[in-house]
Amino acid sequence: MIFPSAADEGAIAAVRVPSFPAGNRRRRKIENYVFFSVSYRYICRHPKQNLAMALYRLESDRTQIGIDLDTKTRDNNLRHPDYARHAQIMRLVYVQSLLSGQSILQTIPSLADHFPQLDPFNPEHQACVCCIWDAAFDLHRPPHVRIGRTDCAYFFTERAACEYYRNYSGMSSAQLCEVQVLETYDCFTGDMNWLDAIDESTATARDIAAAAVRYWAGEMSADPLPEVLFQGRYRLTPVP
């Protein structure tokens, strides 16, 4: 058995065993995820800092284009009715991987043996698996970073970075938009390449933790793909 470090113990202490409500669960249509997809983010450190650089977004919901939007009211993962339960399951998976040294893919079936209600191969439950990245990263987010990955909008500093996402499920027909920032509540910029470097077929919780530490430190890789986590008011304008 791999004994946990002090940081691991802190992560373990934050996790409680989830309860599973009876009855059918609501099906979640996953349009912006791939099974074990990774997409991770970039930074502005002060909540009132202006975003002077050009920003872009690949928007799959065309009703959101051309109107004033506010992250306080716009739909996001955190407001999804199943998110809290899914994220709790994934924290449990993450901590079990820390304790056992098993990969995430090895850990999920072992948990499914103990929790029959969790079926990692059921499309209805794949959202649980997708939550692993957000759930794991939140366990390592430092206190001074107030913005999380579940209650924000995601912007890029380059058009090419938006095009990178067209290969993701549900994004092939999304509209490339320029972002007009109306008001900034908070923002953070991180390099999602730390996540892309993870081999999802063999990754353990400690591999994810190492990437998370670099991500939240704002450290850039040799070939960075910076992405902005944004909270505030903004408007999207289509780019021809």
Language model: regions and residue ranges:
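Basic polycationic patches enriched in arginine
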Residues: 16, 25-28, 41, 45
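Active-site-proximal specificity loops/subdomain of glycosyltransferases
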Residues: 124-137
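Aromatic (phenylalanine/tyrosine) cluster motif
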Residues: 3, 20, 33-36, 40-42
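Conserved NAD+-utilizing ADP-ribose enzyme module
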Residues: 32-33, 38-39, 50-54, 62-127, ...
